[in-house]
Curated annotation (Swiss-Prot):
Gene: RTNLB17
Protein name (Swiss-Prot/TrEMBL): Reticulon-like protein B17
Transmembrane segments: 177-197, 202-222, 286-306, 349-369
Composition-biased stretches (Acidic residues): 382-415
Organism: Arabidopsis thaliana (Mouse-ear cress)
Main subcellular location: endoplasmic reticulum
Membrane topology (UniProt): Multi-pass membrane protein
UniProt feature, compositional bias: Basic residues: 126-138
Boundaries of every Reticulon domain copy: 168-355
Region (Disordered): 1-110, 126-152, 382-422
One matching Pfam family: Reticulon
Record localization: Endoplasmic reticulum membrane
């Protein structure tokens, strides 16, 4: 037998091998079909819809309750579908080359479950209120500037007036010598310089006009020198309610003080009427000679001199006034022609004065009569407190009254002496 050469043998083997390798296995990354014994997962939803998962519900807005409920329902359906697929195709997933992708999807499913649980807890909780960046109303009310109530306003006004009164009294009474000397010297210098100045005529209209010219020149120069680049921001000056209230609070104490003093002066009391009437009569009679500048000058000098002198020499002045009163009373008591003197004085005044002066003289006489009547007659309401006070006095106070009684004895002796002199005068007149 002839044996075949080796190269022929190799050719036949290569041909068979080529035939076997003509149909190579189609390897692909697709899923390996499961065995026919394993049942396919029955799901009416296609695979595309399952893979196209909805976005994470945490990214959606949580403002509306209806949107939250819809998201939770959709997530629950997706989780159920994935669970069914996992039960049926677990073996295929193990045999599939896409295990990393499936594990990734499983982790996403676990995250979605946790998100669903969080959403359910959020739905169960009550809706939260919106937080405002601003402070609460109580803090805002507390931070606002407190306004003076109507009840605290009189107290503040009274405190301001008391403070002003203390400052003026300290200056006038020379308690602080340095300040009083400074103000007195400055006032004297200004008034004396104005007295020696000649040809100076002050007018309110001219002063306002000059001030307006100065302001106009200043505004023009500032506008020309300080020009801005096409941006002229003009400040709009306007008066607001706060400005009006602030100015009213400043002016209110002085206004209330003026009203109270005016009502006190014109109250109609006899004592106050006798004090105010002479000044008003002098002002009405010689008002044309009094100017504002002279009045301020006299008021300045008198305010810095008279109060201090009166406080230093009060006792001496009161003693001299009492002596003058006693002498006048003694002379009037000794006079035997009282009616003649009174009648002559009344007729002279009536003939030498005008009708206006007569009317005011009658008015002053009526006020004097009422004042005397008010001082002499005591009402029962005033007598009862005096009696109660006398009963409540202690023994030391009674001891203090003993020297006072000893002092009244010489006064009674002085009163008896004019009566004896009157008797002697009457006897001499009869003789």
């Amino acid at each position: 037998m002839e044996s075949t050469p080796p190269y022929h043998r190799s050719n036949t083997k290569s041909a068979s091998r080529l035939q076997d390798s003509s149909n190579p296995p189609n390897l692909s990354l697709d899923l390996v079909l499961s065995s026919p014994n394993t049942p396919n997962p029955s799901s009416p939803v296609p695979l595309r819809d399952i893979l196209l998962l909805p976005p994470s519900p945490l990214r959606k807005s949580r403002t509306r309750l209806s949107d939250r409920l819809e998201m939770t329902s959709e997530d629950a359906m997706a989780v159920v579908r994935k669970r069914g697929k996992g039960k049926g195709g677990q073996k295929s997933l193990l045999a599939s080359p896409r295990n990393p992708r499936r594990s990734r999807r499983r982790s996403e499913a676990v995250e979605e479950k946790e998100a669903n649980l969080v959403i359910e807890e959020i739905v169960k909780l009550p809706p939260r209120k919106r937080k405002t960046n601003g402070r609460p109303k109580k803090d805002k009310q507390s931070s606002a500037p407190p306004l003076c109530s109507s009840s605290d306003l009189p107290n503040t006004c009274q405190s301001d007036l008391n403070l002003i009164g203390e400052i003026i009294s300290d200056l006038v009474m020379w308690r602080d010598v340095a300040k009083s000397t400074l103000w007195f010297g400055f006032g004297c210098l200004s008034f004396l310089s104005s007295c020696f100045a000649k040809g100076v005529n002050f007018s309110v209209f001219s002063a306002v006009s000059n001030l307006g010219l100065v302001l106009l020149c200043g505004s023009f120069l500032s506008n020309t020198l300080c020009q801005r680049k096409n941006e002229d921001t003009k400040r709009a000056f306007h008066v607001s309610e706060d400005d009006v209230l602030r100015s009213a609070r400043r002016v209110l104490p002085a206004t209330n003080f003026f009203i109270s003093k005016t009502s006190e002066l014109f109250s109609g009391e006899p004592s106050m009427t006798l004090k105010v009437t002479p000044f008003l009569l002098l002002g009405a009679e010689y008002g044309h000679l009094i100017t504002l500048w002279r009045l301020s000058a006299f008021g300045f000098f008198l305010s810095f001199t008279i109060p201090k002198l009166y406080s230093c020499y009060t006792h001496q002045i009161s003693q001299k006034v009492e002596r003058v009163k006693t002498r006048i009373g003694e002379a009037w008591g000794v006079c035997s022609h009282k009616k003649i003197l009174a009648g002559s004085a009344v007729t002279a005044f009536w003939n030498l004065t005008s009708i206006r002066t007569r009317i005011f003289a009658v008015f002053i006489i009526l006020v004097i009569f009422r004042y005397r009547r008010q001082n002499l007659q005591l009402t029962p309401e005033e007598v009862e407190p005096v009696e109660n006070e006398q009963e409540e006095e202690t023994l030391p106070q009674e001891e203090e009254t003993v020297p006072q009684e000893e002092e009244t004895v010489p006064q009674e002796e002085e009163q008896t002496q004019p009566s004896e002199e009157r008797a002697l005068v009457v006897v001499v007149a009869e003789t």
